[in-house]
């Protein structure tokens, strides 16, 4: 007798072992038809999996997130099947699920073209319509390796050699194609109805630039055509909002080959940067932080003591001088501990909150660099809080409150919070981790925030909270972090004198709100499609004269506004007013101030708001008041 507990709490009993598909069929024909897989005692399995023991089971359909993952994984295999049919000499490697889709890497003797992708996608559709059953079998390591060698698939044979001896080797087959995979997969290819191949890119075997270069075909797959259409529309909109394109169009920044992963900020871009930095500076100062500045280059011995030299060396830029090794800092924390250690600290000094707009450098692979989103040189709105164990919950509450307020001011209303919990390999006792994790939970609860818990995802030195902001296109970006550190204060010898005169280690909280300033500015540019709110815009207004006779008035008006703190420029060129309006409209300036003879004589200005909205003619004081109202409204 096998007892199966279903998600609603009901229990079904079966005389003999049953498959997931048979359980679904016993519940109803609709569920049997919709079943894509099962979740057996928390593990995803195929519908063909036999259940021979009492267990908890959920039937997975396309309404579940896991169901969509199964569809995407199976579509990756469908892609490989189609490629092998059309291009038999191509070798298959790996094909995982990624956000919004999948990819599969191939080794082939020529580049795949857009025309090839069309053929492959058409063949995938033909195979899917055949509704071929997908079968799974478990085989020995030798049998699997021998099979793939016999058909010339050397990459698959190499993968098998790297699989742990304790793991099962599973082969999935449909039609004339067999692939190595952990699974699970859909029961038949007919379940794969909505998919599209997107692009081809280069990739290295096992992600190592020393290995062969492969071709990576990306695709997307969905349960409904409407969902795919919505996603493709979002991609079109994302392309229009691409910060690299807007950075060029709005003359904000550029990057060049001589300095990969580093940003050349132009005047308008640097003005935008300064608005963000000065805003953040005001917020952390108001929250009781003390701003510091630490060296960019520090001796190897400090990085060895912190553990970075041993564990992070390949991502650090290093240099040598007078027979001493140095590293350009990839992060600010060791330097902040040095400031804390400089002098004897008392419990009365705590909490101490050190903030720094710290310039860091990391040796990211050149292939991973992506505009402002992935760089080698970046500035963090970094801070470290040194406090007692009794204070860390209050400090966490204060940080949560600050972070939520900052995100709202920048126009981000939807924040997903994730709490990463203890990994298997970790420092500290279970009791210490219990207190740390519960303390972060209590802080989130006190702020009225909901969160998702990620067991095993914490760093070895402590749990952390991550803050994921959603942009205007619904994309999620992890920006903020609150990381509790149980290790670094001890490694670097940080201590304070407790009330009983004993020496104790402070609790150290690493925290950032925007994270990398470069990346956050990229997110901001795309979120607002380059049309920054007036409080952030590099120029809040541009004064435009219609003819030569208004040049003096337009110039005087520009100076008057500048003295009142408005970021304004004057465009006094001898060009048609329609040309100047169009040019500054494309630059997404919040306000265009047009002056002709009537405005000059009346000492007024004609105001056009972004989007072509005509606000009419008004005295300059009225415009300044309107702008000030805009600036107040963001808070």
From Swiss-Prot:
Enzyme class (EC, first level): ligase
EC number: 6.1.1.3
SUPFAM superfamilies linked: Class II aaRS ABD-related, Class II aaRS and biotin synthetases, TGS-like, ThrRS/AlaRS common domain
GO CC field: cytosol
Residues that bind Zn(2+): 333, 384, 510
PROSITE patterns: AA_TRNA_LIGASE_II, TGS
Location within or outside the cell: Cytoplasm
Biological process (GO), any one: threonyl-tRNA aminoacylation
Disulfide bonds: none
GO MF terms held by the record: ATP binding; metal ion binding; threonine-tRNA ligase activity; tRNA binding
Assembly information from the UniProt record: Homodimer.
Name listed for the protein in its UniProt record: Threonine--tRNA ligase
Native organism: Burkholderia ambifaria (strain ATCC BAA-244 / DSM 16087 / CCUG 44356 / LMG 19182 / AMMD) (Burkholderia cepacia (strain AMMD))
Gene encoding the protein: thrS
């Amino acid at each position: 007798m096998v007892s199966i507990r279903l998600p609603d709490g009901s229990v079904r009993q079966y005389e003999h072992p049953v498959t997931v598909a048979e359980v679904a069929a016993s519940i109803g024909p609709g569920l049997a038809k919709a079943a894509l897989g099962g979740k057996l005692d928390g593990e995803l399995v195929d519908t063909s999996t036999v259940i021979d023991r009492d267990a908890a089971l959920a039937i997975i359909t396309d309404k579940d997130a896991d169901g969509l993952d199964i569809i995407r994984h199976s579509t990756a295999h469908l892609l490989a099947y189609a490629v092998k049919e059309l291009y038999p000499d191509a070798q298959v490697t790996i094909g995982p699920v990624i956000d919004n889709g999948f990819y599969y890497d191939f080794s082939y003797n020529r580049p795949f073209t857009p025309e090839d992708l069309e053929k492959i996608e058409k063949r995938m559709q033909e195979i899917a319509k055949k509704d071929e059953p997908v079968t799974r079998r478990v085989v020995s390591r030798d049998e699997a390796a021998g099979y793939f060698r016999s058909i010339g698939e050397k990459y698959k044979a190499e993968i098998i050699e790297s699989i742990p001896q304790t793991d099962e080797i599973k082969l999935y087959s449909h039609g004339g194609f067999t692939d190595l995979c952990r699974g699970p997969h859909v029961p038949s290819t007919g379940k794969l109805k909505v998919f599209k191949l997107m692009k081809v890119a280069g990739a290295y075997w096992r992600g190592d630039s020393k290995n062969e270069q492969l071709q990576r075909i990306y695709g997307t797959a969905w349960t409904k055509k409407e969902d795919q259409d919505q996603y493709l529309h979002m991609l079109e909109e994302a392309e229009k909002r691409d910060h690299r394109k807007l950075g060029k169009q709005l003359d904000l920044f550029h990057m060049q080959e001589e300095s990969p992963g580093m940003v050349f900020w132009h005047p308008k871009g640097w003005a935008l940067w300064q608005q963000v930095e000065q805003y953040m500076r005001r917020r952390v100062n108001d929250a009781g932080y003390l701003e510091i500045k630490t060296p960019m280059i520090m001796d190897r011995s400090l990085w060895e003591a912190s553990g970075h030299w041993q564990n992070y060396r390949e991502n650090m830029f290093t240099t040598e001088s007078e027979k001493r090794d140095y590293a350009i800092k990839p992060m600010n924390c060791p330097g902040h501990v040095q400031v804390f250690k400089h002098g004897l600290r008392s419990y009365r000094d705590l909490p101490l909150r050190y903030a720094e707009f710290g310039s860091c450098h990391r040796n990211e692979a050149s292939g991973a660099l992506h505009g402002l989103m992935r760089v080698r040189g970046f500035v963090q709105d970094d801070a470290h809080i040194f406090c007692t164990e009794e204070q860390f919950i209050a400090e966490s509450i204060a940080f949560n409150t600050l972070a939520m307020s900052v995100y709202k001011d920048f126009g981000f209303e939807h924040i997903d919070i994730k709490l990463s919990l203890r990994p298997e390999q970790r420092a500290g006792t279970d009791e210490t981790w219990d207190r740390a994790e519960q303390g972060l939970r209590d802080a989130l609860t006190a702020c009225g925030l909901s969160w998702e818990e990620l067991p095993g995802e914490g760093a070895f030195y402590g749990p952390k909270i991550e803050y994921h902001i959603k942009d205007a296109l619904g994309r999620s970006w992890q920006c903020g972090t609150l990381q509790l550190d149980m290790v670094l204060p001890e490694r670097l010898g940080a201590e304070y004198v407790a009330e009983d005169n004993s020496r104790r280690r402070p609790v150290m909280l690493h925290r950032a709100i925007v994270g990398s300033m470069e990346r956050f500015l990229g997110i901001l540019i795309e979120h607002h499609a380059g049309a920054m709110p007036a409080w952030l815009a590099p120029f809040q207004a541009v004064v435009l004269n219609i003819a030569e006779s208004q040049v003096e008035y337009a110039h005087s008006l520009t100076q008057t506004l500048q003295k009142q703190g408005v970021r304004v420029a004057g465009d006094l060129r001898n060009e048609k007013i329609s040309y100047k309006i169009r040019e500054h409209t494309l630059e997404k300036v919040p306000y265009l101030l047009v002056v002709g003879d009537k405005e000059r004589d009346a000492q007024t200005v004609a105001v056009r708001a972004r989007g072509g909205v005509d606000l009419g003619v008004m005295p300059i004081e009225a415009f300044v008041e309107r702008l000030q109202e805009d600036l107040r409204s963001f808070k």
